């Protein structure tokens, strides 16, 4: 995949070359999208809209730390949707990981989550965030146990993941209507990179075959159900709904 690769660390250790080789990235000086190594983290920038700033994954500080400490925890809609109850903490495959926010929420309340991400740039951002998270004295211990990244296409990986999870979580890219500055900023940068998930409808059936209990699909409230398969079961919040579909139980 072609992208502009930039190093602002001031180091001469060849980290950029290692990054490119690991994720199959090719430097393109004229690409409007840039993957930038800064002294703090790896970030994605839209060079023709510098005011949007950089997008990076941070499990330790910022909004994620606030959500972990002061958010709803088990009461969050995504936690309710995957079925967390009492001692039941399902094993989850997040097949459209993105920046890992919902996966992190589930991990922070006790679920083991395997994140799938097919875009190599997004996977590199996630990996960078995980590396810093794993090294953190506060959250590193449980984060290493509960949150992992698999760089693979969901369409192929969903057919051969083992062991099978109890829940598959899907949050395909869908054009956002929200006017919030953060969503607009992130979505503009993100959609410039990955575009809409045109093959997202093809995820529902393999997800239902893989999950032993349920599939949860996050949708904006104005979006049709994934693959036009309606379900009466959903957790509804302001602006979103989490559609719930039956999985395929394990056979003895």
Curated annotation (Swiss-Prot):
Q: What are its E.C. numbers?
A: 2.1.1.242
- Which positions in this protein are listed as binding S-adenosyl-L-methionine? 101-102, 117-118, 153-154, 171
Quote the catalytic activity from the record: guanosine(1516) in 16S rRNA + S-adenosyl-L-methionine = N(2)-methylguanosine(1516) in 16S rRNA + S-adenosyl-L-homocysteine + H(+)
Pfam families, sorted: SAM_MT
* A GO CC term attached to the entry: cytoplasm
**Which EC class, in a word?**
transferase
* Keyword vocabulary terms for this entry: Cytoplasm, Methyltransferase, rRNA processing, S-adenosyl-L-methionine, Transferase
Per the record, the major location class is cytoplasm
What GO molecular function annotations does the UniProt record carry, in alphabetical order? Answer: rRNA (guanine-N2-)-methyltransferase activity
Where does it localize?
Answer: Cytoplasm
* Family membership: Belongs to the methyltransferase superfamily. RsmJ family.
Summarizing the function annotation, the protein's role is:
Specifically methylates the guanosine in position 1516 of 16S rRNA.
| Matching HAMAP family | 16SrRNA_methyltr_J (MF_01523)
Name of the protein in question: Ribosomal RNA small subunit methyltransferase J
Q: What gene codes for this chain? A: rsmJ
């Amino acid at each position: 995949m072609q992208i502009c690769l930039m190093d602002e660390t001031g180091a001469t250790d060849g980290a950029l070359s290692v990054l490119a080789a690991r994720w199959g990235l090719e430097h393109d000086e004229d690409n409007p999208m840039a993957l930038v190594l800064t002294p703090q983290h790896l970030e994605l920038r839209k060079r023709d809209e510098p005011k949007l700033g950089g997008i990076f994954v941070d499990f330790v500080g910022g909004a994620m730390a606030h959500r972990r400490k002061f958010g709803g925890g088990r009461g969050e809609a995504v936690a309710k949707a995957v079925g967390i109850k009492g001692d039941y903490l399902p094993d989850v495959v997040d097949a459209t990981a993105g920046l890992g926010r919902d996966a992190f929420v589930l991990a922070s309340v006790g679920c083991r989550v395997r994140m799938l991400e097919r875009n190599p740039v997004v996977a590199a951002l996630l990996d960078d965030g995980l590396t810093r998270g794993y090294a953190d004295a506060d959250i590193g211990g449980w984060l290493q146990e509960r949150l992992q990244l698999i760089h693979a296409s969901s369409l192929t990986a969903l057919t051969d993941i083992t062991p099978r999870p109890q829940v598959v979580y899907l949050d395909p890219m869908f054009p956002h209507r929200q006017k919030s500055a953060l969503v607009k900023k992130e979505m503009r940068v993100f959609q410039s990179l990955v575009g809409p998930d045109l093959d997202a409808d093809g995820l529902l059936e393999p997800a239902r075959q893989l999950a032993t209990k349920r599939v949860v699909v996050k949708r904006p409230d104005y979006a049709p159900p994934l693959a036009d398969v309606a379900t009466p079961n959903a957790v509804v919040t302001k602006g979103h709904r989490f559609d719930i579909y039956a999985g395929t139980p394990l056979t003895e």
